[in-house]
């Protein structure tokens, strides 16, 4: 009996399944991305059912990009924390044209030769949840939340249910890997439908579409995510080689060609004046859109310029979010409290009658500092106008002085710290008033909480409530006191049993093994974040070496500028801090590290500066190769620079190198030099 007499062959079935997948993917793309249906719903449903039946009969035919795999898997038990291949930076915010111009002036100081009409790309900022998508050879392999920017939660199963996210890229020649960033959101229509359904079932209503989208993505059951019908706009693409060199507008066009939805109202603006006009136009029109937008993202068009400007620890220097004016509401100021932070900064906080703003109820707002108090001329009992800056953070905008009670008393910052009673100081050229008493309970509490945080010493179980008890009972007056605590003493604390006490003692003991870079970050030196701490610890491999470094030596470290260098140098001159270092060393903390061991010393003593875009290497890759050969990479050109490695469209660093007669290398010459160093 022949195969034709018994039914279709396995090959024919596989071909039909492949054909169905392609037809359904094309129809889904046309419907959800282009909004141009090419197939009636009934036809789509019939083809979908045919593919579903084939896959049920032949499970080996199921592929990760099959439309049937969007429906949702079985509920998960939790989300795994995953490392982003490329960090998800947040954006600096601007709330008016003046702040936008200030940003523009800042980046131009770093790239002074860029013409006035450098070019900007304006994109509407979607009010949703930031998402990172990872593709390998064209297939979606992972999706994650932003998290802290470095690590997020892996929610691939949930993201597969969003029909505007392609499971397979629309290209015959996909790169080995591709990272796509974008915003998952709920349309206003779907948001209203969901709240209507929840109200019928007696469930709590979502406060706003952003909260609904973020909460939906963290559902353990993908079937719930599928039911809520999230949408997605892509706004960033990163990949190897040519994929990494697209200018901003071209990168958005590329995303669209790969099958992604991209917010359609983007615009290239040659000048900042046109950016401001775009923002003004959309501020008036934004409520006509079918989804929420809370501002305009302004990015430099040139990818070369983006690469040259790079990032701060938190933001890209080449982009900013220009936020719309928020909704405002009047309320009555009841009183002002003063908080003391871990650096001793006094922050006045307005306490006012609860008021609804942007979907949430607020009753407190920071007043920042004494200057802001003076500008507002606040009096207790005033009627104040409150808004949400960026529709997230409450702030006091102005005072309605015509409504001020006759007996209202002005608000002023105290001359003594509300926590310890010691006189406060306001250093010259600073807006912040500070308590400088290192034993102030508020400063000690803040220092302990920071020391125990995940990126510092990572002491599990040492939370804010326990820290409050330890400080209020006088058991801990400085970080080093933690290492004298024992289990019986801890077990005597409120709501703290023997088991918890034993666990905390073990966690504190374990923290003695944390590396020098974490200890340095845990010290809480102003301006020294975890990245800067790693860079400093790699260069100065002990607390003693760091303490003896001059400001110039500190500023020469990659990523460290004069402000950070001065803060570090000043910290080590304070006697209290010197005593703390000695006590930590006695307690067994790691105040010594090991310098990164280069594979060779062939480039020892030579300093390199990187500028422009290299053909195949990223800056971090080039830096790692140089350091592995014993060389040093600096962020600025000086007479001590040995070589400047210049890529395409190198900027002012190359010009300075030429003026100083410093040798220049291209990528090929750098690789040749490194090859010689290897042997």
UniProtKB/Swiss-Prot annotation:
Active site: 125
Domain of life of the source: Bacteria
Residues involved in NAD(+) binding: 41-45, 90-91, 123, 146, 183, 299, 323
One annotated GO biological process: DNA replication
Record: residues binding Zn(2+): 417, 420, 435, 440
Record domain BRCT: where: 598-679
SUPFAM superfamilies, sorted: BRCT domain, DNA ligase/mRNA capping enzyme, catalytic domain, Nucleic acid-binding proteins, RuvA domain 2-like
Protein's UniProt keywords contain Transmembrane helix: no
Cofactor(s) demanded: Mg(2+); Mn(2+)
The keyword Manganese is annotated on this UniProt entry: yes
Listed EC numbers: 6.5.1.2
Catalytic reactions on record: NAD(+) + (deoxyribonucleotide)n-3'-hydroxyl + 5'-phospho-(deoxyribonucleotide)m = (deoxyribonucleotide)n+m + AMP + beta-nicotinamide D-nucleotide
One Gene Ontology term of the molecular function aspect: metal ion binding
Gene Ontology cellular component list: cytosol
A UniProt-annotated Pfam family: DNA_ligase_aden
InterPro entries, alphabetized: BRCT_dom, BRCT_dom_sf, DisA/LigA_HHH, DNA_ligase, DNA_ligase_AS, DNA_ligase_CS, DNAligase_adenylation, DNAligase_N
Keyword line: DNA damage, DNA repair, DNA replication, Ligase, Magnesium, Manganese, Metal-binding, NAD, Zinc
Stretches that traverse the bilayer: none
Enzyme class label: ligase
HAMAP family per UniProt: DNA_ligase_A
Function: DNA ligase that catalyzes the formation of phosphodiester linkages between 5'-phosphoryl and 3'-hydroxyl groups in double-stranded DNA using NAD as a coenzyme and as the energy source for the reaction. It is essential for DNA replication and repair of damaged DNA.
Classification via PANTHER family: CHROMOSOME TRANSMISSION FIDELITY FACTOR 18 (PTHR23389), DNA LIGASE (PTHR23389:SF9)
Family recorded in the similarity comment: Belongs to the NAD-dependent DNA ligase family. LigA subfamily.
Protein's UniProt name: DNA ligase
């Amino acid at each position: 009996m022949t195969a034709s007499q018994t039914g279709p062959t396995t090959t024919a079935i596989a071909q039909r399944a492949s054909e169905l997948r392609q037809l359904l993917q094309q129809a889904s793309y046309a419907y959800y991305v282009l909004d141009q249906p090419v197939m009636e719903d009934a036809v789509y449903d019939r083809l979908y059912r045919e593919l579903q039946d084939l896959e049920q009969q032949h499970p080996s035919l199921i592929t990760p990009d099959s439309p049937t795999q969007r429906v949702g898997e079985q509920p998960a038990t939790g989300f795994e924390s995953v490392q982003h291949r490329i960090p998800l930076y947040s954006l600096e915010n601007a709330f008016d044209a003046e702040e936008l111009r200030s940003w523009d002036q800042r980046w131009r100081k770093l790239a002074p030769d860029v013409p006035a009409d450098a070019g900007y790309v304006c994109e509407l900022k979607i009010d949703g949840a930031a998402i990172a998508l990872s593709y390998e050879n064209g297939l979606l392999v992972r999706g994650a939340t932003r998290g802290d920017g470095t690590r997020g939660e892996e929610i691939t199963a949930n993201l597969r249910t969003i029909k505007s996210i392609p499971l397979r890229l629309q290209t015959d020649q996909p790169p080995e890997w591709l990272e796509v960033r974008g915003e998952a959101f709920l349309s206003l229509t779907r948001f209203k439908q969901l709240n209507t359904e929840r109200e019928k079932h007696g469930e709590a209503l979502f406060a706003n579409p952003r909260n609904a989208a973020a909460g939906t993505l963290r559902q353990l059951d993908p079937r719930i995510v599928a039911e809520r019908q999230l949408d997605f706009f892509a706004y960033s693409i990163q990949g190897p080689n040519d994929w990494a060199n697209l200018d901003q507008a071209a990168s958005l066009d590329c995303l669209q060609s790969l099958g992604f939805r991209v917010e359609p109202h983007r615009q290239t603006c040659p000048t900042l004046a046109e950016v401001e006009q775009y923002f003004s136009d959309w501020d008036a029109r934004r409520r006509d859109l079918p989804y929420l937008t809370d501002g305009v993202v302004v990015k430099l068009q040139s990818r070369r310029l983006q690469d040259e400007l790079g990032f701060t620890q938190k933001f890209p220097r080449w982009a900013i979010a220009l936020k719309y004016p928020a909704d405002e509401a009047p309320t009555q100021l009841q009183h002002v409290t003063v908080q003391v932070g871990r650096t001793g900064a006094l922050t006045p906080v307005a306490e006012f009658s609860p008021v609804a703003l942007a979907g949430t109820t607020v009753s407190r707002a920071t007043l920042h500092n004494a200057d802001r108090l003076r500008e507002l001329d606040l009096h207790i009992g005033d009627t104040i106008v409150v808004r949400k800056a960026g529709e997230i953070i409450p702030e006091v905008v102005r005072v309605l002085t015509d409504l001020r009670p006759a007996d209202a008393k002005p608000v002023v910052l105290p001359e003594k710290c509300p926590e310890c009673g010691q006189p406060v100081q306001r250093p010259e050229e600073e807006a912040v008033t500070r308590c400088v008493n290192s034993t102030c309970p508020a400063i000690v509490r803040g220092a302990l909480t920071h020391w125990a945080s995940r990126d510092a010493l990572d002491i599990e179980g040492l939370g804010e409530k326990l820290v409050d008890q330890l400080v209020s009972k006088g058991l801990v007056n400085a970080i080093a006191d933690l290492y004298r605590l024992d289990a019986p003493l801890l077990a005597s604390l409120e709501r703290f049993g023997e088991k918890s006490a034993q666990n905390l003692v073990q966690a504190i003991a374990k923290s003695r093994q944390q590396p020098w870079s974490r200890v340095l970050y845990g010290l809480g030196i102003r301006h020294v974040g975890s990245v800067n701490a790693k860079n400093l610890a790699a260069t100065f491999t002990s607390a003693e070496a760091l303490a003896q470094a001059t400001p110039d030596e500190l500023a020469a470290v990659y990523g460290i500028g004069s402000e950070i260098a001065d803060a570090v140098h000043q910290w080590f001159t304070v006697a209290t801090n010197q005593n703390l270092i000695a006590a930590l060393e006695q307690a067994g903390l790691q105040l010594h590290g090991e310098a990164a061991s280069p594979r060779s010393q062939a480039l020892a003593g030579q300093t390199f500066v990187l500028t422009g875009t290299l053909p195949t290497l990223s800056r971090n890759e080039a830096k790692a190769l140089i350091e592995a050969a014993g060389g040093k990479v600096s962020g600025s050109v000086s007479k001590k620079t040995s070589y400047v490695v210049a890529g395409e469209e190198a900027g002012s660093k190359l010009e300075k190198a030429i003026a100083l007669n410093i040798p220049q290398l291209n990528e090929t010459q750098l690789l040749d030099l490194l090859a010689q160093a290897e042997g």
